[in-house]
């Protein structure tokens, strides 16, 4: 059985990743901070595909949440083989309105949350089969333009996340754990979910994307799925961009 913990998996990229990886012989901890209905819906879809699935709620900005999520995988499925750190949010608050507290919130959810997940997951991953860690970054840490929204706090948090991925790839290599990052560009949101950009900003973004469209969650999930697959066993410490050419 291949056992997965996918954070932020009640919708969007996280949900698409679970669907892609699900099948007989797989098991999932489906995580959400507040969207319990979405998480339960995803879990039901995974079970329909022959997978085992359990829902776990929690705010990764809070101490103890990451550890509890990993413990759920170990207790329910006997261990952990794949960690996908997808939870996070975009904050485009400008400098004048960005308080230190709000800035630190982005760092807690994205950076400190990933640190806690990695620390808690290290031992069960090392004992697992073909262990993988994939973090989900963002183009906002790479694309800075005067004609596009700037995400100051998110850029800092996601840029730091990529640095952590590279450092952990070195530290966890002796345990055969690969650590990589998938960096999405502008990706369509599921209906009913909140976007950090207005409809006008979404339309304007198309002009900056060489392929002329926003991406689909399933396209990002495909990159994550590759990094979790046997052919990616020799890939570690890398950032794989999925952005239609937005960042080249």
Region annotations inferred by a language model:
Residues 24-40:
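Conserved glycine-rich Rossmann-like NAD(P)H-binding loop of the short-chain dehydrogenase/reductase
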Residues 134-160, 165-174, 186-187:
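Catalytic loop of short-chain dehydrogenase/reductase
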Residues 130, 173, 178, 235-237:
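Short, small/polar-rich loop/turn modules that mediate ligand/substrate recognition or access, typified
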Residues 94-95, 99-107, 193, 201-205:
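Substrate-binding pocket helix/loop in short-chain dehydrogenase/reductase
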């Amino acid at each position: 059985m291949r056992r997965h913990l996918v954070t932020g998996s009640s919708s969007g990229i996280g949900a698409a990743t679970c669907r892609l990886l699900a099948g007989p012989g797989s098991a999932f901890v489906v995580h959400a901070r507040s969207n319990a209905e979405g998480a339960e819906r995803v879990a039901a879809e995974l079970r329909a595909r022959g997978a085992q699935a359990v829902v776990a709620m929690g705010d990764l900005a809070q101490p103890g949440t990451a550890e509890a999520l990993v413990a759920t995988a170990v207790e329910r499925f006997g261990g952990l083989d794949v960690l996908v750190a997808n939870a996070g949010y975009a904050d485009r608050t400008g400098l004048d309105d960005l308080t230190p507290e709000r800035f630190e919130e982005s760092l807690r959810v994205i950076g400190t949350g990933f640190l806690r997940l990695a620390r808690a997951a290290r031992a069960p991953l090392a004992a697992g089969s073909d262990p993988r860690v994939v973090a989900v970054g963002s183009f906002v840490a790479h694309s800075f333009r005067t004609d596009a929204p700037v995400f100051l706090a998110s850029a800092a948090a996601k840029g730091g996340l990529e640095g952590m991925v590279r450092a952990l790839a070195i530290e966890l290599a002796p345990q055969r754990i690969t650590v990589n990052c998938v960096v999405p560009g502008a990706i369509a949101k599921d209906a009913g979910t909140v976007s950090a950009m207005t409809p006008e900003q979404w339309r304007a973004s198309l002009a900056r994307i060489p392929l002329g469209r926003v991406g689909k969650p399933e396209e990002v999930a495909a990159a994550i799925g590759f990094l979790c697959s046997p052919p990616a066993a020799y890939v570690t410490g890398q950032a794989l961009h999925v952005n239609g050419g937005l960042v080249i």
